[in-house]
Amino acid sequence: MAKKSSIEKNNRRKRMTGNAAAKRARLKTIIADKTKPMEERFAATLKLAEMPRNSSATRIRNRCELTGRPRSNYRKTKLSRIALRDLGSRGLVPGLVKSSW
């Protein structure tokens, strides 16, 4: 089980990303638009740099929904390999069958 503070920190980052996504996208389009004057694009760059780092989507870590484990996660199920194997062996994941040949 991961530390509760790490899980909560990641949840806070998810919330901040959701709140600031529209503003961040608007600033990025201004920066990328070459038809706008250089001063306006530079001002947008400064505003983007002033925004909190945790409002960026790249700061979010994929974690297991059950255990909070940060590594070896399957995106489709949002579970770590350990949790997926445990739930799969108990028959709690639909469509997952233990392999035998």
Curated annotation (Swiss-Prot):
Q: Which GO terms describe its cellular component?
A: cytoplasm; small ribosomal subunit
Q: Would the keyword RNA-binding turn up in this protein's UniProt record?
A: yes
SUPFAM superfamilies on file: Glucocorticoid receptor-like (DNA-binding domain)
Has the keyword Cytoplasm been applied to this entry? no
Keywords assigned by UniProt?
A: Ribonucleoprotein, Ribosomal protein, RNA-binding, rRNA-binding
Give start-end ranges for the coiled-coil region(s): none
- Protein's name according to its UniProt entry: Small ribosomal subunit protein uS14
Instruction: Write out the biased-composition intervals (Basic and acidic residues).
Output: 1-10
Q: Which PANTHER family match?
A: 30S RIBOSOMAL PROTEIN S14 (PTHR19836), SMALL RIBOSOMAL SUBUNIT PROTEIN US14M (PTHR19836:SF19)
By its UniProt entry, which Pfam families does this protein fall under?
Answer: Ribosomal_S14
General function of this protein? Binds 16S rRNA, required for the assembly of 30S particles and may also be responsible for determining the conformation of the 16S rRNA at the A site.
User: Would you identify the family this protein belongs to, as annotated?
Assistant: Belongs to the universal ribosomal protein uS14 family.
Region annotated Disordered, chain positions: 1-23
* Subunit-level organization: Part of the 30S ribosomal subunit. Contacts proteins S3 and S10.
Tell me a Gene Ontology molecular-function term this record carries. structural constituent of ribosome
Annotated GO biological process: translation
